[in-house]
Amino acid sequence: MAQQAADKYLYVDKNFINNPLAQADCGAKKLVWVPSTKNGFEPASLKEEVGEEAIVELVENGKKVKVNKDDIQKMNPPKFSKVEDMAELTCLNEASVLHNLKERYYSGLIYTYSGLFCVVINPYKNLPIYSEEIVDMYKGKKRHEMPPHIYAITDTAYRSMMQDREDQSILCTGESGAGKTENTKKVIQYLAHVASSHKSKKDQGELERQLLQANPILEAFGNAKTVKNDNSSRFGKFIRINFDVNGYIVGANIETYLLEKSRAIRQAKEERTFHIFYYLLSGAGEHLKTDLLLEPYNKYRFLSNGHVTIPGQQDKDMFQETMEAMRIMGIPEDEQMGLLRVISGVLQLGNIVFKKERNTDQASMPDNTAAQKVSHLLGINVTDFTRGILTPRIKVGRDYVQKAQTKEQADFAIEALAKATYERMFRWLVLRINKALDKTKRQGASFIGILDIAGFEIFDLNSFEQLCINYTNEKLQQLFNHTMFILEQEEYQREGIEWNFIDFGLDLQPCIDLIEKPAGPPGILALLDEECWFPKATDKSFVEKVVQEQGTHPKFQKPKQLKDKADFCIIHYAGKVDYKADEWLMKNMDPLNDNIATLLHQSSDKFVSELWKDVDRIIGLDQVAGMSETALPGAFKTRKGMFRTVGQLYKEQLAKLMATLRNTNPNFVCCIIPNHEKKAGKLDPHLVLDQLRCNGVLEGIRICRQGFPNRVVFQEFRQRYEILTPNSIPKGFMDGKQACVLMIKALELDSNLYRIGQSKVFFRSGVLAHLEEERDLKITDVIIGFQACCRGYLARKAFAKRQQQLTAMKVLQRNCAAYLRLRNWQWWRLFTKVKPLLNSIRHEDELLAKEAELTKVREKHLAAENRLTEMETMQSQLMAEKLQLQEQLQAKTELCAEAEELRARLTAKKQELEEICHDLEARVEEEEERCQYLQAEKKKMQQNIQELEEQLEEEESARQKLQLEKVTTEAKLKKLEEDQIIMEDQNCKLAKEKKLLEDRVAEFTTDLMEEEEKSKSLAKLKNKHEAMITDLEERLRREEKQRQELEKTRRKLEGDSTDLSDQIAELQAQIAELKMQLAKKEEELQAALARVEEEAAQKNMALKKIRELETQISELQEDLESERACRNKAEKQKRDLGEELEALKTELEDTLDSTAAQQELRSKREQEVSILKKTLEDEAKTHEAQIQEMRQKHSQAVEELAEQLEQTKRVKATLEKAKQTLENERGELANEVKALLQGKGDSEHKRKKVEAQLQELQVKFSEGERVRTELADKVSKLQVELDSVTGLLNQSDSKSSKLTKDFSALESQLQDTQELLQEENRQKLSLSTKLKQMEDEKNSFREQLEEEEEEAKRNLEKQIATLHAQVTDMKKKMEDGVGCLETAEEAKRRLQKDLEGLSQRLEEKVAAYDKLEKTKTRLQQELDDLLVDLDHQRQSVSNLEKKQKKFDQLLAEEKTISAKYAEERDRAEAEAREKETKALSLARALEEAMEQKAELERLNKQFRTEMEDLMSSKDDVGKSVHELEKSNRALEQQVEEMKTQLEELEDELQATEDAKLRLEVNLQAMKAQFERDLQGRDEQSEEKKKQLVRQVREMEAELEDERKQRSIAMAARKKLEMDLKDLEAHIDTANKNREEAIKQLRKLQAQMKDCMRDVDDTRASREEILAQAKENEKKLKSMEAEMIQLQEELAAAERAKRQAQQERDELADEIANSSGKGALALEEKRRLEALIALLEEELEEEQGNTELINDRLKKANLQIDQINTDLNLERSHAQKNENARQQLERQNKELKAKLQEMESAVKSKYKASIAALEAKIAQLEEQLDNETKERQAASKQVRRAEKKLKDVLLQVEDERRNAEQFKDQADKASTRLKQLKRQLEEAEEEAQRANASRRKLQRELEDATETADAMNREVSSLKNKLRRGDMPFVVTRRIVRKGTGDCSDEEVDGKADGADAKATE
């Protein structure tokens, strides 16, 4: 069933394809493809052809449509439906390719061959075509034998690697989400199965399993969900799988490229970060969550979109799979935990929040819980970490300074740290996997590389990462195009094949140059690197430079409008991509906070410190900020000591990758995305078409069909296919090319199917596969024949054996029959009885003879035994001698071998030296010849020089004469140049018109001359006036039109400036409107106030009193508002204190034990808190009471005033008139005030918005102003140019006005051309037969056009000269002809209409020509297709003829064999019946066995589940015990932490007082130390230099002979250069840190003053803390007593342990001694062993207790640190509360005093006057209050703005000063650096020389020792030979041994040598 399901997705249904009805229907309907907006192309039947158009009937709905013939594409017959290789299509066009892919995709067939490569369409669902059965199906099969599959591509790559011994690569290309990663996994799966040294999956090797598990690990850490793809690779990888000679996998290596690390900190909408974060948070258990401090998804800031799930994937299960994969990969658990800790730490980094302090820009960390978690996870100190982030040490000059960071800088540092940590972890993981995959010792012979890189990405806005990804894909596509199209055709030309080079127009090099070109002009990456070196460079300046350098590049575009968010556009092969250059400089430099980096390098966690081991190579933030301003523009290249940017590193990586790929044989897999909705079974035709066009699929198929994709070397072709032509090549024939020609003739191949090159035979696609099939058939025939011969031989042998057996049986039968006849005959019986008796008599005689012989033999035997004993003794002696001789021989052979080796070396050296000598002699001869030649040349040159000198003298005199002429001609030349410039401009403007009229200009000129003569002779003055008027009118009108057009062009040129100016104008308009509104409102308010004041001044004293009351009331209201604000502040502080107190409560409740002392402390703190709360509540109550009293008093005063008003109303009737007038005025004022208030409210609302916008837009406004000024300059320049252009245009108008008269002649000519076009259209129908004639006509037309163009150019130049003269004449005549403008206008209109008609006709002609070109190209393609089909048909005919011949031969053979097969069939049927019965019985037995196996597996599963349950229950019990122990340890740790905390609290105040002195001393010490270090380094370098100079002088003579060691020395030099770079980087950092330290010192001095003030404040709080400290001391003493007891107990336990160990040893000795004493001893032994075990248990308990105590001590220290920080916070809060309380008390006192004064003043002064005017006060009171409040707010805002302005100005001045200081320091540092570099380079050269000489001496010494050893061996061998010559070897050895006794072998040899020497004397 599984196989059937797989076949559905692999094989095509043949019934549908071979349907005859469909074939007939296609032929009858004339089906074609027509364009469709919905489906790309849709089928239609061709009904009728009408000229250029055709009428078609759509198959889908029967609708008839008119379509242009060029848009119609042919349809393939139904038999080509769902074809596996699209190169087989008869009609190759876009519609056919798309239709074939669509049909296969909808049938589940996702793989399709496209010529030499494979096209894959993502199915977006799982298909059953990747099982092991499918792998076995494709294993070892040829490509044409199986349907298309990724396994087939992989198998062909594997087989070609094994056959050709050439490295292979499989490149998966395509957009993001097209399925590259999945296909890569399938490639690795296939190779791991096919190339495994283990046969079955159960026996699968560890390396293969690790190789398969590498992908899941990398996907978890490097893949993420994007909008386009749920498992998008956010990095590129090149997997290199190494194979040995036998084709087995011996190792692998993975290289990664450009991890998108920014995804770790932020993600786009509906996207995820890397999978591992979600896996960990979902799959981690409770224990792991507590260890890693994990939190829910929504608590992490770096997870931008929270918990985004992937459909069909469980993150929890994926976590388990990832951990299992890491286990298989061999990553230990501690490293796994290190990885998970780093991941949790990265997430926690995002939770660190910084806030800006109130008075400064400095950042602060109000809550450090996240920082504590990060520090715990990464193994670093919290305080150092926070200090490194908030106030890092930065080098300023030579000193280090602590610099306070702003909020933005701190946030950037945290994000950069998170990205760098994750990237380093990923890099470590890749190295770890490579280490695991490359551990085999077998050598790799070749490799297959699989490339899976991030696909092409086009988002709404694309950043630096997308540029790098798209740049990579551009390079890969270029490699594909170069391999498929360029290299293929170049090889054809190189091999001398007849081939016309086809340009497919797919060169992507311009786009690649735009990105990567280093200079002339520099590309985008080069410009980015260049900008990174400029300190004031910004992203905007980078964009401006890119636009300036690459603005005219064809692949580069500027954004059309400024409102577009993009900065620039690049036209890639996959489409136009908009890029936004935000933070590109930072991304390219990738800076880091080096303080935190060094802290991480010093981490207590080994894993973290290993990640940051290369901390010296990072780019610090100070390095980026303090880069030299004097960096040259070309300084972006890598130099000594300079950091390398991300772009540079990536470009180098990519260059290496491309070099690797070029050295391999590439196999391309083109992955295509069917839709953007990720839906299965849906295919967007337009999307697929775009991808096919971009990837060059059609061109690849076309070159595969037209070209010769298969090629074989001559020798290999002969070796492989000679079996097909056995007798075609004569024996001993050596010429490979001629042999191949003879073979091809014998094969009867069509000449169109092959080409023979210089070294290879080339075949069209399919031919080689056909030859392979024939070869396989031939080999099977040969093997069958061989098997038949073998079987015949064996049968004949068996027959002969049977014949021998038959003859033997016949003999036996004959003898048996004779015996049966004789046995009853009497004489036979008598013979049988008498014969033994005769033998007995003879036997006695024989016995006597034998006894005599036996005695003789015994004697001989004894003699032989004696001889044998003698011989054995002799043999033993000889064997000993033989062994000695063998040893001697072996030594001699070894010496000979060594001597031979030495001789070979010497001869090799001699040959090398001779070769060198010969080379040198040849060089010397060449040099001598050159010298002679140069001397001869020198003589000639001297003669020439003399001649030239004479000529120079003559010319000098002529030159002086010419100098005078030059001065005069220069003025003329300038004028001519100016005229020439004007003429060139005119030519540029008239170029377009000239192209249209070039072919008829000559005729126009002649007509013009005739017309001018006629006009002069006939028209006279009238015609002259009319001509002048027409010219003037035309000139005026055209001038106006051209000015309009120039205005349009100017607007286009200023497109960017208009957009900017529009935006700026809008903003300025808004600001101006708001300012105007504000000014109007303020003016209206001032006018209203002035009116009120004037009216009030005119009134009597009562109004003055009213104003005084109003001022007092406003003061009271201000006081009330200030009190309310104070109250709100106090309430906020109260809330803060309450929250802090509650937090402290919770912390104290968590940390403190339930002891009595702790409860007392807690109760005291609670009492203090309650007291504080009561005091606050009392203060609040008193405050509220005071406010209530004030309100009551105020209301009473108002009521009294109201009563007085009523009394005064009755009494003072005289004031009623004045009151009425005032009331009318008041009403008017009220209306005005209401209107003002409404307007003011609106303006206030707008003002707030504008203030918010102003801050954002001020920077933009300033930039806009700058741009506007630049554009204004450009506009002014353009205006000047326009003025000059208008003058030129006026002149050209006068010329064109005359030309328009003769345009009527063009009409007849255009009619002629139209008739020609109609004739061409008629001829177009018969183009297929007359194509060659058309090409000839076209060539002739082109030649005519070129000739006409040349003539037109000449005539135009003449005409321009005449026109210039005419223009000058006409200018003079223009002044007289102003009167006749109307007639000229009419004539002009007519001519304009004629011109438009002519231009339209010309455009129609051009369009018709374009259509003809299109039809020609289409017909050319159709002709190519027809030719290819013809080739196929010829090939098929020849194949059919061959098959027919073979079939006839086979038919004759089959007839003869059929009779034999009939007999064998009868026998086989009988045997088959017997075997069937046996098979049935075996099947039954097998079924029974399978049932038993199933039962056993079921029982096994049950037992496993029971075991797992038991283990889980056991684990739960262990976990609970572990948790209890952990809690106990935590409590003890808290106790220890409290102790240390109290000790630190006492020393805190003293530390703050001494801080200033310590800082000053440290700074002085640092300066002195730094200077000492520099002096020491200089002295050391000088000493080393002197020593090296001495060594160099001694070894100069030897260095000349060591030229061969130069390569080794160069390697050492490179290492030293790297060290030098590191040293220079250190020096740079040291200088920068020194400069920053100076700045930090100044800041610290300012801070110290503030600290001194803070110290005074803290002294007040110190007394309170001391009281708490005393209580804590009591607790500490009790805890110390407990500690002492614990320590005593520990010491006692250790003593007991030692005693127990001693007792154990003694008892063990006693047991050993008393083992033989019996039962009592055994009992004693058991008792003692039990006692030992008890003691050991007690010892282990004591050790555990000590460990617990140590843990508690550590935890107590940590807790004390936390309590210190909490206490500091409490102090600050208490101080703030105390200050707030004092302020409130002061305010209360002041308010009381003011109230009393007001009450007394109101009662005494204003009782009489208030009564009359109280009503008016009540009405105007609210209005005035509101206005005063608004004024106060406005004044406050003004003050704030002024403060901000002052701060900004101060900052600007500080920055300017700092910049000047930096410049000076940088100059000094650069000079110092240059000196150091020179010294280091000299030292390096000397060191290299010394090392080379040292190595040479070592080698010579080794050679000398070797020669000495060889000589010693030769001497010893000669001595041995001499010994053998004087006396026998055995005797001498015996003598020596007797003499030496027990001496060593060396002494024996020495003595023997001495004896030999004496003997010789």
UniProtKB/Swiss-Prot annotation:
The modification Phosphoserine is found at S628, S1114, S1715, S1944. One of its GO terms (molecular function) is calmodulin binding. InterPro entries: IQ_motif_EF-hand-BS, Kinesin_motor_dom_sf, Myosin_head_motor_dom-like, Myosin_N, Myosin_S1_N, Myosin_tail, P-loop_NTPase. ATP binds at G174, E175, S176, G177, A178, G179, K180, T181. The keyword Metal-binding does not apply. The keyword Transferase does not apply. The modification Omega-N-methylarginine is found at R1924. Cellular myosin that appears to play a role in cytokinesis, cell shape, and specialized functions such as secretion and capping. Required for cortical actin clearance prior to oocyte exocytosis. Promotes cell motility in conjunction with S100A4. During cell spreading, plays an important role in cytoskeleton reorganization, focal contact formation (in the margins but not the central part of spreading cells), and lamellipodial retraction; this function is mechanically antagonized by MYH10. The rodlike tail sequence is highly repetitive, showing cycles of a 28-residue repeat pattern composed of 4 heptapeptides, characteristic for alpha-helical coiled coils. This is Myosin-9. It comes from Rattus norvegicus. The lineage of its organism: Eukaryota, Metazoa, Chordata, Craniata, Vertebrata.
